[in-house]
Amino acid sequence: MERLPEVPSPLVDRFGRVHTDLRFSLTDRCNLRCTYCMPAEGLNWLPRAEVLTDDEVVRLVRIGTERLGITEVRLTGGEPLLRRGLPGLVARLSALDPAPELSITTNGIGLARSAVALREAGLSRVNVSLDTLRPERFAEITRRDRIKDVLAGLSAARDAGLNPVKINAVPVRGVNDDEIVDLAAFSAEHGYQMRFIESMPLDAQGAWDRDRMVTAAEVLDRLGERFELVPVGRQDNAPAEEWRIAGTDALVGVIASVTRPFCGTCDRVRLTADGQLRNCLFATEESDLRSLLRRGADDATVEGAWRTSVGGKGPGHAINSPEFRRPERPMSAIGG
């Protein structure tokens, strides 16, 4: 048996960025049809035979933690709660040695009935996407009348000890930008952390409009009209710049992916549900790790492909450059 080093060699790109955070999409399927993400009829989902099995997911995460220095794994989708047997998969991942910190990004539907099981399996934290508090607007944005399920999921996650519970919202001009203050106040009242994310050109329809993007600066201006904000800064390589609402413990963060890119400190790498490694959210090329696994490649070969991919990572996403090219995969097929 191959002897592994006690401390894995860091996963470093040519700019010296060390990658410790893995975003792993478990499915491209979703039970919502958000207007800024996909068409009403949905997308052509991956055939199930092309989706990584639980054994393949566990093996790739194990290679990441044992050989590459991955310390955090966020499970994403599509909607990861649609993955059958998710608590069992989480339990297997949390039993790895070394074990990564496990978190999940979800739309919250189904979280009310699974939060306790996920926490007991080893999940630490949860981010829930919620762009509005108004039931009729939620139905318009998501094309589904499920806001009660999302709110119940938030409460269940908090009560199960999946802390911090963070709410992710994408403010879009003329759609929900009038709820920025309300969302922050709601989060503070219920013990959640709020994150406002600038919209990015990752929708399946290719309809992203920069003029409808509400910038991080605008978000802070609107919050500042209601709250006194105390700067907290940015934690390590986290993308969110954080503020505390004065007189409370409530935190509000903004992720300025477009107007203040943080590519220079990026520590993330992504795996899609069909086993394609992406060294950047906006990458136009992928490395096929699934084929390596299914051809019987050993761990060292998979590790080598992983390092080669990250070694070729570019300096940034180039959204603000005339040469910017959208990735062929939409966000729902990449994983957030």
Where do the model's predicted regions map?
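Canonical Radical SAM [4Fe-4S] cluster-binding loop centered on the CxxxCxxC motif
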Residues: 14-55
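Glycine-centered loop/turn positions within well-structured domains
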Residues: 32, 135-136, 261, 287
